């Protein structure tokens, strides 16, 4: 552990790179790796509850922060998706929760998923949503990721569920960004992009 910056390297992976979102083979390999991990149906004794986290973050930054003029309306829309998610969610298993492309290390013959601090029991489709929103994918590229992950299970119901997760998760990261801003760290650009995604995918979830 580096005492100056807190960085810890437990094992250095030679000749590895993070998932390149411009390389479809990288994206395919990482998404299929994620699906394979979920299919193991691993269980732990703690869960990641998306809406519980939203409430927690709201409590830390103020229920109705004023970063955006229509934030109250947007919040109501995001909260209204909870019932849709509850009625459609798939069987929980151990999920990474933060499977962003930076956390996939790709080698010639192997893939490694790092940074498990948020992991817990959840709907595996939430992991797919998290992958897409961090990369700030447009709908066409998002649908391609969903297609790769779902394979033979691909259906409109699962797509709508992933869109709902994307909307709610984006709102969660808006709150996270606001908390960071209140502590003196500027994530405004990221916060704005996540806010736009939350509004956009709320609409897709209802179509």
Locate predicted features.
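Pre-DFG segment of protein kinase catalytic domains
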Residues: 94, 112-115
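Active-site activation/catalytic loop segments of kinase-like enzymes and analogous catalytic loops
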Residues: 125-154, 167-185, 197
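ATP/Mg2+ or Mg2+-diphosphate-binding catalytic cores
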Residues: 63, 69-72, 175-207
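ATP-binding pocket architecture of kinase catalytic cores
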Residues: 1-51, 58, 62-73
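An alpha-helical support segment within catalytic cores of ATP-dependent transferases
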Residues: 42-97, 107, 156
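Start-of-helix signal in alpha-solenoid helical-repeat scaffolds, especially tetratricopeptide repeats
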Residues: 160, 164-168
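Hydrophobic residue at the +6 position relative to the catalytic HRD Asp in the kinase catalytic loop
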Residues: 102-104
């Amino acid at each position: 552990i580096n005492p100056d910056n807190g960085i810890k390297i437990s094992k250095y992976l030679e000749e590895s790179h993070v998932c390149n979102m411009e390389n479809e083979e990288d994206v395919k390999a990482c998404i299929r790796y994620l699906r394979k991990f979920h299919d193991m149906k691993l269980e732990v004794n703690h869960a990641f509850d998306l809406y519980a986290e939203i409430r927690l973050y709201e409590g830390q930054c103020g229920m109705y922060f004023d970063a955006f003029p229509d934030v109250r309306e947007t919040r109501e829309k995001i909260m209204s998706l909870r019932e849709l998610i509850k009625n459609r969610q798939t069987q929980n298993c151990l999920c990474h929760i933060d499977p962003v492309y930076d956390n996939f290390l790709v080698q010639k013959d192997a893939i490694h998923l790092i940074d498990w601090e948020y992991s817990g029991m959840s709907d595996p489709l939430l992991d797919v949503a998290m992958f897409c929103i961090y990369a700030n994918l447009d709908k066409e590229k998002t649908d391609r990721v969903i297609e790769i992950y779902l394979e033979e299970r691909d259906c409109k119901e699962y797509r709508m569920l992933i869109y709902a997760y994307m909307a709610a998760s984006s709102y969660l990261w808006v709150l996270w960004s606001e908390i960071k801003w209140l502590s003196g760290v500027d994530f405004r650009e990221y916060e704005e992009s996540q806010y736009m995604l939350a509004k956009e995918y709320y609409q897709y979830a209802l179509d």
